[in-house]
């Protein structure tokens, strides 16, 4: 019976179990035990991580709308005290600034309108 040729020059290798040396077998058993212990520990760690994830991913309890509304309503008094209210001086300044900007915009509009009427583009009343 002919041996099959392996592609790319691969050779048949002897397995470790083919050796009769007891020291090699003992080392092999020790390494196998260490690897199995490590895999068991990793499996246990992954289980604890999975349980931690499950605890973190617990669904939130839905609060009814009336409860949310009452919490909002009764919590407003705390929020009102936290709000920084504008001072009267700043309020007057902001109001005058808005009036000034509005007056400038109205002046520009009526100025352009009067210019068009003077040029005859629009007919006056």
Curated annotation (Swiss-Prot):
Region of interest (Disordered), ranges: 36-57
Q: Among its keywords, does the record have Heme? A: no
| Cellular component, GO annotation | membrane
GO BP terms, alphabetized: protein secretion
Its protein name is Uncharacterized protein MG055 homolog
Q: Which domain of life is it from?
A: Bacteria
Q: What is the lineage of its organism?
A: Bacteria, Bacillati, Mycoplasmatota, Mycoplasmoidales, Mycoplasmoidaceae
Mind telling me which residue stretches traverse the membrane in this protein? 92-112
Localisation: Membrane
How does it sit in the bilayer? Single-pass membrane protein
> What GO MF terms are annotated?
protein transmembrane transporter activity
Keywords for the protein's UniProt record, in alphabetical order: Membrane, Transmembrane, Transmembrane helix
């Amino acid at each position: 019976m002919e041996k099959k040729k392996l592609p790319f020059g691969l050779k048949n290798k002897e397995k470790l179990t083919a050796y009769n040396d007891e020291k090699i077998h003992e080392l092999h058993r020790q390494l196998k035990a260490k690897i199995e212990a490590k895999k068991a520990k990793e499996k246990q760690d992954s289980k604890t991580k999975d349980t931690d994830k499950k605890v973190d991913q617990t669904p939130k309890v839905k609060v009814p709308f009336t409860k949310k509304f009452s919490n909002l309503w009764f919590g407003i008094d705390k929020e009102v005290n936290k709000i920084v209210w504008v001072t009267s001086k700043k309020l007057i300044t902001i109001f005058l600034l808005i009036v000034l900007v509005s007056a400038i915009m109205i002046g520009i509009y009526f100025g352009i309108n009067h210019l068009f009427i003077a040029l005859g583009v629009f007919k006056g009343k």
